[in-house]
Amino acid sequence: MSSASVGKKPEHVNTPPGDNQQKSSKENQKSNKDKQSSNQPPGQIPHSTNSGTRKSSGSGLKTANLKHPARPSTESSTSSSHHRRPAQEMNGTSTATATGGGGTSGATTTASSGAPAASSGGSSARYSSSGRSHPTSGSSSSHARSTGQSGMSSRSAARRNDQDVHVGKYKLLKTIGKGNFAKVKLAKHVITGHEVAIKIIDKTALNPSSLQKLFREVKIMKQLDHPNIVKLYQVMETEQTLYLVLEYASGGEVFDYLVAHGRMKEKEARAKFRQIVSAVQYLHSKNIIHRDLKAENLLLDQDMNIKIADFGFSNTFSLGNKLDTFCGSPPYAAPELFSGKKYDGPEVDVWSLGVILYTLVSGSLPFDGQNLKELRERVLRGKYRIPFYMSTDCENLLKKFLVINPQRRSSLDNIMKDRWMNVGYEDDELKPFIEPPKDQIDEQRIEKLIQIFQLGFNKAAILESVEKEKFEDIHATYLLLGERKSDMDASEITMAQSLLSHSSINVSSSLGQHPAGVITREHVTSSSASGSSASPSRYSRSSATATGASITAGSALASAANAQKHQQSSAAPSSGSSSSRRSSQNDAAATAAGGTVVMSGTRHGGVQMRAQPTSRQATISLLQPPSYKPSSNTTQIAQIPPLFNRNSTATSSAAQPSTGITGTRKIADPKGRIPLNSTAVQGHRTATGAVAANNGGIPSHRDHAQQQQYMNQLTSSTMMSKLINKTPAAGGTAATSSSSSSSATSTAPLQKSGSQISHAPTEPVIREDDDENNSENQNGNVPLIGGVGPQTSPAVQVPTEDATSSSDKEQQQQKASSETPKESKPSMIHQSPSMPPSQMMTAMESLKLSESGQTGGPTVATGGPPQRATSQQMSRSATTNSANMGASSGGAAAAASATNQLSGAPSSTGASSQQYHPKAPSSSSSSSTNPPHQHQLTHNASFSVTPSSYQIPTSTAVNVTSTGMPTSSSSSAFPRNTRNRQTFHGKTEKDKGGDDSSDEIGETPGNVSIGATGPSANNAEATIWSKLSKLTRRDHNRESMTQPVSGRAGTIGASQGQQTAAALAAIREQSGPIAPGAGQVAPSLPIHEGDVKPRSLRFTWSMKTTSSLAPDDMMREIRKVLDANGCDYEQRERYMILCVHGDPNTDSLVQWEMEVCKLPRLSLNGVRFKRISGTSIGFKNIASKIAQELNL
C-alpha cells in the first residue's frame, strides 16, 4: 500500500460496534473499491486497524460536490503564525470545506462516487484516499454532519482519545490556528512540560515554488537565536507532512493589544520598541531582512516581551545586489517599493519600523487611505500628522525612520543611540545584540539529556546533536530545557524517562518498504534533502494555511510500508527539514547501539494526515542531509498517517476547543477581530472563525440589472454634483490641502495588515527570489491595477474550482452579500492582509496608469479634502493568500482589484476589483458580468448604497472588490481582506513575472487562499469577508449612502471606471471644488437613509462625551451648540459633521470632525472629536468648550 503523498488519507476513529454493524453492508458493497484503490500507490493508504470496529468516521460522506482548487498557492496560508488568534474551530462544526486550498482536488476515483471508502470493520480497512475526504475523528465537518451517526461517533472517539495524541515527543493539546495547507497545534513537550506551537504543513498541497519558500524560511529561522524572535526548536517530517516546533507566544499580537487597550504610553512603547529594534538590527547584522514587519507579526510572550514572527517574506541580502520584490503590507511599505525601485534591503525594514513606532504611540497608522492609490500617494508624499500628545523626542525619532529617500534613512545602529530610545535607560543604552557563541554548551543541560535519553543515546551522540544543531529530539530537548525557569528534579527526570518509553507516537518517515513499518535510519537520512532551510519554521503565511488538517486521536497505526511505497513512487524524497534525521527516529529513541526500538503510541492515536487526492507529489524534500548515519539497525516506528485531508474539513478542530493562539497567523478569514480581554493576553482568545469560510460565496450585493442601474445613478449628473459638493465649506481649502488630507489619513484606525501570501507577478522578470519568481501566472496577463487583462476576470472565476458555475457563484455572492450587511460595523482597527508581490506590483502599475491619464489626472482620484481615514484606525489585514488574489488574475488581479477600484485605474480583472475595465467587462463568473462602466465606485465615493455593496467579496485578495459589488472603501479604509491591507509579495513593476501564482492562481479559488475551509472558494471568500468586515469596516451603509464624498470623492473615479473618472476630472478642472456654504448640510445620498446607523467605535479614547440619547437627537444638539459658538460646519454624513472655527487669515483657523458613534458593548452613544487642521491648542480650546456646552 502506498501512503499517497498526493492522496487523502481517511482517518480512523474508534466507533461503537453498533455503528459498524449498521454500515457494514455498505462497506461490504464497497470493499471491492477499497481493494482496488489499495493498488493505487498515490491514492490510498491502508491503515492497520487494531479492532474490527475501527472505521473511517467519514465513511459514506459524499465529497464529490466539493470544489477543489488545483494546487493552491503555498503562501496563501493564513494560519501561519502559530501564535495568532485561534481560528474558529466551531466545536461541533469545524468547517468542513476543504476548499480553502485543500478542497478535494479532483475527487476522481472512489471519492467522486461518494461510496464509503472504509472497508467493513475488518482487520485492515483500506481507504481510497484518492478523492474522499474523511473527516477525522472529532471533526464535525459539514460532511460529518451529513452522516449524522458516524460523525457523532467520531467526535466522541476524538474526545476519548484526543488527550493521547502525540507527535514525536509532544502531546497535542488543541488547535490554535488553521489555514489551507497547515494547521497549528498547541502542544506540550512531554519531557520538559514546556508548551510549544507545532505547525503542521501538508507538503503535498504545495507547489515547487512554495516549497522553496518554506525551505528558505526554515533555513533562515535556523540561523536565528535572539530573545525577541520566535525560536524554531525542531523540524520533523514524513513523506507528506512537515512538523515545525516553534516557540509559543501566549500573549498574542501587538495588534490585538492595541485594539484592546488603545495606544501605548511612550514609556511602554519605548520598552517594546527597544526590543523590536534590537531584533531587527540582529537580523540585519546577519544579512537577513524581514520585509513584513507590522503590528500583526509582533507577538507577546507571557511576560509581555516582543517576539517577531512570520519570516515568510524574509530573504538574505548583500550590499551591491539589489532586491526588487515588493513584499509586506502596504501601510508599512516603504516609498521605494511603491515607486517600483530596487532596494538594498535593510532600509525597507527601517521604514516599517517607523510605521510601527507611530502605531504604538498613536494607535493609528501614519499613512492610510481609502484605497491603495490614496495610500500610495500619501506614502510617496511622506506627509503624516504628529499627534499633539507625541513628545518632541519621539517626533524627531520618527523623522529618522520615515524619510522618503532611502539613502538618507538612518541605520538601526544609529537609531539605537537616539535620545528617545534611551530615555530611562541611561545606564543601559541600547546596543547591538551579541549572539552567544555556538560552541558554548550548557553542561548541566547536557547531563540532564544524558539522564533522560540514557536508553537511546550516549553522550557523544547527544553532544553531536547539540553542537551541530540538528533540530531533532535531543537538540529540541536541549533548547527547551533552557527555557525552563526551574531545573528538572529527579522525579521529573524519572517521569520523563517513563514517558519516553511509551508516550510518543513517532512520525514515520515512511521511506522504503518495510512491511512491519520498520524504517531504517539510513533510509530516513539518505532521503533527506540538503537544505536545512527546507522546513518552514515560522507561523507564516507561506504554508500556514491548513487545509483542515485533522488529528484523529484514535487513528490506527498505519503501516509504514504504505507510505514508503508511495514515497518511492513520488519523485521527491521527504526529509525532515532541519534535523538530519526525523524526529520520529528520535522519538523511537533508537538505542545507541542501533538496536531496533519499537515505539507505540498510547492509543495508537497519532496525527493522521490525510493527503488531498491531488496527483501532485511533495516536490521537494525539506529534510536536510543527515549529518551522520547511524548503524543500519532499524527503528520500528508507528506510522502516523498524514494529517491533512484537504477534502475534509478541519475536523480535528471540532474536537478541540478553539483557543487563543498567540503566534499563529490568523486565518485569512477571521470572523472578526475581537479586542483582547484580560485573559486574552494570556493567550486565550475568542476563536476567529475559519468556520465562516464555509458559508458564503463571493458576495455580490445586487444582480447585474441592479448594478447597472446603480452605476447609472452614480454617473448621473446629480451624483457627480454631489461628489463635487463634498468639499468642506469655510475650511475647504485647508481640508483639500495635501497636508490636511494626509493628516486625516494618519489618524486612520489601525487596520491589520495580515500578510497574504502572494503569488509572484505574472511575468518573471528579475529573479531576485527563486520562489518569488517561479511560476507563471496562468492569468498573469492581467495587470493588477491598470491594464485590461484577459477578459475573464480570474478573481471571481478562479474560485470556481472544477464544479463551481457562475450561477453558483452568483448565488453564493448573493448569500454572502445578504449576510455581510449586518457585519458592516467596522471595528476601528482593521487587519491589513499582506499582499503578494504580483498583486501589489500590478496594483502599482495600474495606479500609475490611472495617474498617467486614465483618471484624467494623477490627483483626480485622490485629490480632495482629507479622507476620514481616522475613523478607520488600524485595519488589520487578514493574511490571505495571494493565490486567492492571484487566482482571479494571476495574482495581479487581486492587487488590481483593490487598487483599481480604489485607484480608478481600470482593472483588468473585473471581478477582482470591480475596477473599471476599459476594454472589456470582466468575464469572471461571479460579478464580472458588469461592463467596465458599471463597475462600482470605491468606498471613497461612498456610493455603495447597500451594506452588501460595501462588503468586499471574501475572495481573498482578488475579489476584494469583486466586480459585482462596489466596495465602499470609505467605510473601512482597508478591511482585512482588502488589497490595501494585504501584505504584498511580488516583484516591483519592473519584475512582474511571478510563477508562484501560476498554477495556483488559475487553479485555486481566489478566496481559498484566505484559508477558507468552505467547500467552495466562493464560500470561503464570502464568509471570510463577512467575518473580517464585522470588525474592519464601518457601517458602510451610513458612510457610503449619506456621505457626499467631499474629501474622499477623489478616489471614486477610478473604481467607477474611466467615464466617471474622466467626468470628475473635467468637472474639477472647469469649476474646481465647490464648497457648500458654511453651516450648510451637504447633500447626501438619500438611498436607504433610514438604514444608516452610527458607526460602532472600537477605539473609545477619542470620545469626548457619551449619552443615552438617540443619535439624531445628539446631532441636533451638536448643530445647536456649533451655531451658538459661531462655528461653520458641513454635515458630511448623517452622523458626522465637519466643523470650522477661527479666522482663515490668521493662524487661529481650526478644522475638526464631530461624529456620533455607538459604543461597543454598551447601549450608549458618544461624540468623537478629531482634529483635521489647525494648532492643537486651538483645537483643544474650541473642542473642550463645545463638549462642555453639549447638553447630552
Swiss-Prot record:
Asymmetrically localized to the posterior of the zygote before mitotic division, then differentially distributed to the germline precursor cells (at protein level). It is found in: Cytoplasm, Cell cortex. Phosphorylated at Thr-325 probably by par-4. Residues 24-36, 986-995 have a biased composition (Basic and acidic residues). Residues 1-163, 522-541, 558-601, 648-673, 727-938, 959-1052 are annotated as: Disordered. One of its GO terms (cellular component) is cell periphery. PROSITE patterns: KA1, PROTEIN_KINASE_ATP, PROTEIN_KINASE_DOM, PROTEIN_KINASE_ST, UBA. Its cofactor is Mg(2+). GO terms for molecular function: ATP binding; metal ion binding; myosin II tail binding; protein serine kinase activity; protein serine/threonine kinase activity; tau-protein kinase activity; ubiquitin protein ligase binding. Belongs to the protein kinase superfamily. CAMK Ser/Thr protein kinase family. SNF1 subfamily. This is Serine/threonine-protein kinase par-1.
